Regions:
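Small-residue-rich segments of transmembrane alpha-helices in multi-pass membrane proteins
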Residues: 17-26, 169-184, 244-249, 340-355
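Multi-pass membrane catalytic core of lipid/isoprenoid biosynthesis enzymes
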Residues: 84-134, 240-277, 345-351
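Acidic (Asp/Glu-rich) catalytic motifs at the cytosolic membrane interface
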Residues: 62-92, 221-244
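Intramembrane alpha-helical segments
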Residues: 99-194
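Functional transmembrane core segments of multi-pass inner-membrane proteins
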Residues: 170-232, 250-253
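Membrane-embedded alpha-helical segments that form the functional core of polytopic membrane enzymes
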Residues: 23, 29, 41-70, 141-152, ...
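Extended hydrophobic alpha-helices typical of membrane-associated regions
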Residues: 272-366
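C-terminal ends of transmembrane helices
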Residues: 68-72, 101, 149-162, 224, ...
């Protein structure tokens, strides 16, 4: 049991939400199309939707675990974590999820860690292959290979790109547009849609979904910024030149604040323009009429009351989202990285929660 505990600790499960958030957001967007009646799916294909969704979550989760093990292995070989146990704690004296801890500290050999990298990646690939077969999108195979190569060479190889300032961009790309849009394609095609029948065919809808993919990608990049700002001095000593190390803590904090501000604007735009404005106002104006919002969710009908409550919850969560975004910016500005890390994860999860609740709005703009 102790050995299992060490492996779970090395997997750094507290980072999993960052990998799963883009998948959950994409599932929510597809569900809005599905339950709004904008797209028609035969009843038996609902099962495909559920299975495909779980498979997509599995791919993201095990790929994230594989990346964590790979970073543990590669950074350990380069001695990057040797001095990190000496870094300052947060104001309340709490460490950040034992970030300085490595599997080697538990006596686990590097070769075993490398095996863990391979096993996690293999499980992710198996799930990905099933998704490919069910959806018929064979481009997922080369895309998956690119993801595997990118995951390894972030910290592995003789010239890891994560040591040359590309880590934040990589986190944004693979945990944003790639994961989000890839999940959307997997769900649409696995549900029996042809290229001509997909609701995302219009340029405006494609642009809409690409912009939405920036939200989870941005939070992934922010998480890496926090990590790299915290370790900037140590990284430079070990010749790991991250974007934050190049900018310095002051300029890096400013860039971080701008990115968080941009993500808040995107999140607000989604909630206010695409959920609240397009549907909520119409429902308020129709109170007193026999009109009901038709939705195939919850036994085929979602009445005005439930819809209004869901919108109110969305606004409350958005308020909390903005407050925590402010706290996150303040934490990074004050170099309180121990508290900034969990705040960033919570923000990403709140963002995903608003997407899930938006399913009750039943439709996307068109």
């Amino acid at each position: 049991m102790t050995n299992i505990k060490f492996w779970l600790k090395g997997a750094r499960l507290y980072t999993l939400p960052i990998g799963i958030v883009p998948v959950v957001m994409a599932i929510s967007i597809f569900a809005r199309y599905l339950f709004s009646g904008q797209i028609l799916v035969k009843p038996y294909n609902i099962e495909n939707f559920v299975i495909q969704s779980l498979l997509c979550i599995g791919v993201a989760a095990f790929m994230q675990i594989s990346v964590n093990y790979a970073n543990d292995y590669c950074d350990g070989l380069r001695g990057l974590d040797n001095q990190r146990s000496k870094r300052e704690l947060s104001a309340d004296g709490k460490a950040l999820c034992d970030v300085s801890w490595r599997l080697a500290d538990a006596g686990i050999k590097p070769k075993s860690v490398l095996y863990a990298v391979g096993i996690s990646a293999l499980i992710s690939c198996i799930f990905g292959l099933i998704i490919t077969i069910k959806s018929g999108v064979w481009l997922f195979i080369p895309l998956g290979l690119v993801c595997l190569v990118a995951a390894w060479f972030y910290a592995g190889g003789s010239h890891p790109y994560g040591y040359c300032g590309w880590g934040e961009f990589s986190a944004f790309l693979f945990f944003g547009p790639v994961a989000f849009l890839g999940t959307l394609c997997a769900l649409f095609y696995a549900s029996g849609f042809s290229k001509d029948s997909i609701a995302l065919a219009s340029v405006s809808q494609i642009a809409f979904c690409v912009l939405l993919s920036f939200i989870p990608g941005g939070f992934s990049a922010c998480l890496m910024m926090i990590n790299n700002l915290r370790d900037a001095e140590s990284d430079i000593r070990h010749k790991k030149i991250t974007a934050m190390a190049l900018l310095g803590k002051r300029k890096g904090s400013v860039v971080f604040s701008c990115v968080v501000g941009f993500l808040v604007i995107l999140q607000l735009s989604y909630v206010l323009l695409y959920v609240f404005y397009t549907r909520f106002i119409g429902v308020i104006l129709s109170i007193g009429n026999p009109y009901k919002i038709v939705c195939t969710l919850n036994s085929g009908l979602l009445n005005k009351g439930v819809f209004i409550v869901s919108c109110i919850l969305l606004l409350l969560i958005t308020y909390v989202f903005i407050k925590k975004a402010h706290l996150l910016i303040c934490a990074v500005s004050n170099s309180d990285y121990a508290n900034a890390f969990p705040l960033c994860v919570k923000l990403a999860m709140l963002g995903a929660l608003t997407f899930v609740l938006s399913i009750f709005a039943c439709s996307l703009p068109h």
